[in-house]
Amino acid sequence: MTRTRVEAVHIVWITAGLGCDGDSVSITAASQPSLEDVILGAIPGLPRVYLHNPVLAYELGGDSFMTWWYQAERGELDPFVLVVEGSIPNERIKREGYWAALGTDPATGQPITTCEWIDRLAPKAWAVVAIGTCATYGGIHAMQGNPTGAMGLADYLGHGWKSWAGIPIVNVPGCPVQPDNFMETLLYLLYQAAGLAPMIPLDDLGRPTWLFGRTVHEGCDRAGYYEQGDFASAYDSPKCLVKLGCWGPVVQ
């Protein structure tokens, strides 16, 4: 962890994993805080934020957009937070071509794979965040029989991996991610970068504890029916749905 205050933080967001870009779309619906409030500096105490997301940066394209990636690789965007969206394919088992890539190498004209970008940028990132179930756990692409060998970011980098600032991989699952969950996590990291918050608290799965420390059941408005043993027998009932397959008492 670093206590040195920073004036600006870049968010370098890779959407080139195996995914649907649903997490990028989801965060546009965030409200506590909203993406606009964070980027426009409406929240007191935050450093200036520059977002580099290929899905949301519709005014830029091609080589002009990739400039930020090359600058991050050269250490010119310091500090930056690396956000990874989509599961990570195993390029080592791909005999020809590639599974996923973002941009091309200026020297060779060849695509730069998602794995290469992670290898280049993760060691230089102040913090690394996996957004969505695909990036955190591999998602549906990690099912048995998928030829890509897809995996979550922690499986790729290692579950004990930490950034140069000593921050473990931060996992914010969801399909798509619940927008406020991600924005709250990003907000905490920005306050930490500003020296206004301690190390982000994470559970044993790398998730923020204040978001995933309790079960869904604990916050459910049907929990009173559960305590009374009054369970629904049909999905249109307002009563507890645990007998119909709800995993709320288990899922965090």
Tell where the protein language model's regions lie, with residue ranges.
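Iron-sulfur-associated redox domains of electron-transfer enzymes in respiratory
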Residues: 1-252
